[in-house]
Amino acid sequence: MVCLSFFFLTIPLIISVKGVSLEKIKPIIDSNHIHFGENKVQEALEKWSKIKEENKNINLHLIGKLQTNKVKYCLPLFDYIHSLDSIKLADKIANEQVKKNFKPKIFLQINIGDEQQKSGIDFKDAENLYTKIKNDFDLNIIGLMCIPPNVSNTKPFFEKMNQISKILNLNELSMGMSNDYLDAAKNSATFVRIGSKIFGER
């Protein structure tokens, strides 16, 4: 697995490949890295449909916002969805996974900084919404995801995510990117999402 030298802990690394050509991705696949993240469903369909047929061990993660009208294109392409943020979306995924006979692993996206411009569940409503989704839909929810505010110190937000995950008894935490992955790792991140540190700014 590539790029784990960034870390003092062994944490699965999702390489964010939004806008990255297959020419640049192929050597990473050839090095046996398996976790890749895409932000947009359409781009992922164009890039990964054939590659995943040829490389069955690859795990593709949707790390961007998922619109309800795109759910039908997500499965079975994406093994992980990191952006469940509403009852309506939960219903769409639940129906589609029955049609496709494929059950992705799912993260609830938490709006940990209470930012109006960002997607995600209000962290104050996380417990109630998670309970309702868990009771109403047969989804494989494994953890929480967040994108903290763009501030110099993101540590308090990761600490809060860690607390929420313990309250909900969810073991997986998808948090930390190129500029703050160390603080995320110190607060129990189980997946980090790195792009610009590998490919440069896009």
Where do the PLM segments sit?
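Conserved alpha/beta-domain cores
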Residues: 1-172, 177-179, 185-187
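Expand to "…catalyze enediolate/carbanion chemistry for C-C bond making/breaking, isomerization
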Residues: 198-200
